[in-house]
Amino acid sequence: MKVSAVLLCLLLMTAAFNPQGLAQPDALNVPSTCCFTFSSKKISLQRLKSYVITTSRCPQKAVIFRTKLGKEICADPKEKWVQNYMKHLGRKAHTLKT
């Protein structure tokens, strides 16, 4: 009886710490740097430091502006002001790496 209890404990511990137990289906594996809503207000250009463009793994294309205070703000890349700000902040496109 004691042997079977020990074996059961070992089996449960092995299952709990198995990396496959932590795996998630790809459908649920959404990168944390995706935008699901866009800022409804135009941001002051003077507050911005940089930007990145979300990856193709995100459900919608977006621009993430980073402020000088470290805040991240999602914006719609189709908006004219967003395109102008991207040009002003740098000609090189900044894309997030997956």
Swiss-Prot record:
A Gene Ontology term for the protein's cellular component: extracellular space
Q: Report the locations given in the UniProt record.
A: Secreted
Question: What is the tissue localization of expression for this protein?
Answer: Widely expressed. Found in small intestine, thymus, colon, lung, trachea, stomach and lymph node. Low levels seen in the pulmonary artery smooth muscle cells.
Which BP terms from GO are recorded?
Answer: antimicrobial humoral immune response mediated by antimicrobial peptide; cell-cell signaling; chemokine-mediated signaling pathway; chemotaxis; cytoskeleton organization; eosinophil chemotaxis; inflammatory response; intracellular calcium ion homeostasis
Q: What is its main location?
A: secreted
Family membership, please give it: Belongs to the intercrine beta (chemokine CC) family.
Q: What is this protein called?
A: C-C motif chemokine 13
State the organism named in the record.
Homo sapiens
